[in-house]
C-alpha cells in the first residue's frame, strides 16, 4: 500500500514490468486481436479453430518468432464452449500442422469441463481429454518434447483435473474472488 493509493503509474515501461514475466492468454481469442498479443505472449491456451491458427501463424511470421499454443478441445456438454472436436484435432495434427504452421509450436491441449455439480460428467470429460493428450503425445504428429501441457481445471473442478493429469489449472476465481462487472 503506497499511502493509500490504488492507482500507480510510471513513464518508463521497462520499470513497470519485470523482464521475466511469462504472459499466458487463457480466454477466447478473436482473430482481430491476435496482432496485439503475438509480439509478447508466451503461451496461447485457447486456439479453437484452424482459422485462428492461421492468423497466429501469419502474425508470428511478421514478428519473426514462434508462438507456443495449446489446442482447445470441446469436451463439455455446453454449446457456449469453443474448440476442436476430438476428431478434428486428430485430423489437424495428422495433416502436417508443423509444416503448415512453422511459426506455431503446438505444446499441448486445453479443455473446459461442463459447468455442473455432476462429478461423474466432469470426470468423463477430463478423462476423454487426457486420453486424447496421451494418444497425440505418443504419435509422430507432434514434437513430443514440446507437447507436454494439458490445461484443464478451473476453480470449481481443478482437483478432478489434477487427478486426470492436468499440468496447468486456471484458478483466478479461487485467488481473486468472483469477477465483478460494473456499468459506466
Give short role names for the model-derived ranges.
Residues 10-16, 34, 48-65, 117-128, ...:
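Active-site-adjacent beta->alpha loops and helix N-cap segments on the catalytic face
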Residues 13-48:
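Glycine/small-residue-rich loop that forms an oxyanion/phosphate-binding "nest" at active or ligand-binding sites
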Amino acid at each position: 500500500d503506497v499511502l493509500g493509493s490504488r492507482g500507480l503509474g510510471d513513464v518508463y515501461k521497462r520499470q513497470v514490468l519485470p523482464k521475466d514475466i511469462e504472459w499466458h492468454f487463457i480466454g477466447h481469442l478473436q482473430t482481430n486481436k491476435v496482432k496485439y498479443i503475438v509480439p509478447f505472449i508466451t503461451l496461447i491456451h485457447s486456439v479453437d479453430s484452424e482459422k485462428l491458427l492461421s492468423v497466429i501463424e501469419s502474425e508470428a511470421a511478421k514478428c519473426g518468432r514462434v508462438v507456443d499454443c495449446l489446442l482447445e478441445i470441446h469436451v463439455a456438454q455446453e454449446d457456449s464452449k469453443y474448440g476442436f472436436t476430438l476428431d478434428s484435432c486428430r485430423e489437424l495434427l495428422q495433416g502436417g500442422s508443423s509444416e503448415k504452421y512453422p511459426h506455431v509450436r503446438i505444446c499441448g491441449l486445453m479443455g473446459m469441463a461442463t459447468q455442473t455439480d455432476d462429478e461423474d460428467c466432469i470426470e468423463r470429460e477430463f478423462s476423454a481429454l487426457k486420453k486424447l493428450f496421451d494418444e497425440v503425445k505418443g504419435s509422430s504428429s507432434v514434437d513430443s518434447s514440446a507437447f507436454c501441457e494439458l490445461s484443464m481445471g478451473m476453480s470449481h473442478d481443478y482437483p478432478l483435473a489434477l487427478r486426470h493429469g492436468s499440468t496447468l489449472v486456471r484458478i483466478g476465481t479461487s485467488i481473486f474472488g468472483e469477477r465483478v462487472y460494473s456499468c459506466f
